[in-house]
Amino acid sequence: MKNMEQQHIEVVGKLGSTYGIRGWLRIYSSTEQAESIFDYQPWFLKIKGEWQSIELENWRYHNHEIIVKLKGVDDREAAQILANVEIGVDLSVFPELEEGDYYWHDLIGCTVVNLEGYTMGTVTEMMETGSNDVLVVKANTKDAFGKQERLIPFLYEQVVKRVDLTTKTIEVDWDAGF
């Protein structure tokens, strides 16, 4: 494993518990289609706070779970050390998106402002609800409406009117009282 100096890594999953005695591990993918995690290579593992590159040797489905074999991880003991470690990939491997489509990591940290100019807060995370994605917006400490958090559906053009990644601003048609 080599250390990754560059810190442009996005978490795409997590290693789970060991499987068998030959170093296999379960994985939990946070990509839209679970097996899409294998489209993004190379992988980096966050070990003791540092990203280290690792080579994927093999993967397969086993009882509706995905298990992986990593190069150099050849027994249960070596695999146990990696249990629950985050899997990341360099952002440069992600494809360019069409206008109106955004990666969640681009939206997190953006300031949300409604059409009246009221600053509603900052996007802290995204949620997938099945029908649409939702912005989780942490309200400012002195929010005039007493809100701590707002959940705003990411419906482009309906609710989300403009996203400016240069200024990290999202303009929404949303009542500040909600």
Swiss-Prot record:
Name of one Pfam family that matches: RimM
Species of provenance: Haemophilus influenzae (strain ATCC 51907 / DSM 11121 / KW20 / Rd)
GO terms of biological process kind: maturation of SSU-rRNA
Any one Gene Ontology cellular component term annotated for this protein: ribosome
Complex and partners: Binds ribosomal protein uS19.
Single GO molecular function: ribosome binding
Keyword terms, alphabetized: Chaperone, Cytoplasm, Ribosome biogenesis, rRNA processing
Listed Gene3D superfamilies: PRC-barrel domain (2.30.30.240), RimM (2.40.30.60)
The keyword DNA repair appears for this protein: no
Task of the protein: An accessory protein needed during the final step in the assembly of 30S ribosomal subunit, possibly for assembly of the head region. Essential for efficient processing of 16S rRNA. May be needed both before and after RbfA during the maturation of 16S rRNA. It has affinity for free ribosomal 30S subunits but not for 70S ribosomes.
Subcellular location: Cytoplasm
Gene that this polypeptide is encoded by: rimM
Domain PRC barrel: 99-178
Name of the protein in question: Ribosome maturation factor RimM
